[in-house]
């Protein structure tokens, strides 16, 4: 039989969506401050003319397909094949760790995994049964920058102590543009596992004898904080392009991709 499951999430995301005074208090920023920030970001830092604050549509969908077939080869041998595939496409999956992050900061995340399992169950005698299993498992996940940014990502610019005045009250927040700190990164794992168990049942004791062999191939690119970040204090320094600090993690090799092969066994 075959089963398909589909899930879809279209709840919007809100980025400093200022409509009332209560919104200003919640975000610690006024619309006039956002307007000034965005004008600087566009004229001096190349931010897109597309909207960066407000309400945005968000799409996340997951599809899962499961299939199974049982094949009675003969009176004593049953072959079962199962396959489970899951695919997820999550647009604007997450932003960053500043209080307010522009829309361009939000990353996309895609992933899929597939598990294929074949089981041969053989009844050798009334007291003896053998079960042989072979499984391949694939996992892949990729995180990519927002479509408004290059695929290789760009540095972040974090403006701290952004002041807004509402009535007689001063409010402060931090606003960020540029690339999210994780992207781009990807993880791909292949696992091949062979298990053979023999079950011997007596009137008083049930015995299990088995062997398990598992081979894993991993290929990963971890990109956390490797795009770099500039720190500014206040909008005046942001406008004058005078950061007080720059930080970046760098790879010590030309290709930072991590490749690993492991073999595990048990009896």
Name every feature range the model reports, one short phrase each.
Residues 1-9, 14-24, 66-70, 82:
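Predominantly transmembrane beta-strands of Gram-negative outer membrane beta-barrel pores used
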Residues 51-55:
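Surface-exposed cleft-lining segments at the edges of enzyme active sites
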Residues 14-48:
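A subset of solvent-exposed loop/turn segments in beta-rich extracellular surface proteins, enriched
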Residues 4-6, 34-40, 85-87:
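Glycine-rich, acidic and aromatic/proline-enriched surface loops and short helix-turn segments
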């Amino acid at each position: 039989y075959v089963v398909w499951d589909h899930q879809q999430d279209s709840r919007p995301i809100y980025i400093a969506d200022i409509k009332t005074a209560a919104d200003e208090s919640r975000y610690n920023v006024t619309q006039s401050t956002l307007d000034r920030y965005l004008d600087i970001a566009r004229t001096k830092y190349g931010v897109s003319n597309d909207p960066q604050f407000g309400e945005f549509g968000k799409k996340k969908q997951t599809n899962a397909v499961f299939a199974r077939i049982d094949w009675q080869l003969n009176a004593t041998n049953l072959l079962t094949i199962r396959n489970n595939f899951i695919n997820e496409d999550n647009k604007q999956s997450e932003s960053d760790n500043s209080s307010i992050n522009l829309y361009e900061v939000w990353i996309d995340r895609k992933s899929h995994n597939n598990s294929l399992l074949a089981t041969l169950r053989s009844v050798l005698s009334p007291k003896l049964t053998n079960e042989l299993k072979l499984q391949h498992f694939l996992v892949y996940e990729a995180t990519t920058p927002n479509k408004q940014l290059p695929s290789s990502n760009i540095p972040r610019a974090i403006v701290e102590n952004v002041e807004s005045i509402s009535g007689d009250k001063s409010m402060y927040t931090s606003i960020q543009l540029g690339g999210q700190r994780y992207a781009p990164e990807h993880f791909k794992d292949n696992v091949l596992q062979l298990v053979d168990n023999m079950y011997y049942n007596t009137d008083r004791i049930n015995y299990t004898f088995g062997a398990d062999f598992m081979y894993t191939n991993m290929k990963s690119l971890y990109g956390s904080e490797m795009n770099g970040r500039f720190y500014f204090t206040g909008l005046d320094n942001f406008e004058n392009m005078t950061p007080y600090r720059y930080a970046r993690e760098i790879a010590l090799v030309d290709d930072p991709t991590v490749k690993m092969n492991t073999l595990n066994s048990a009896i």
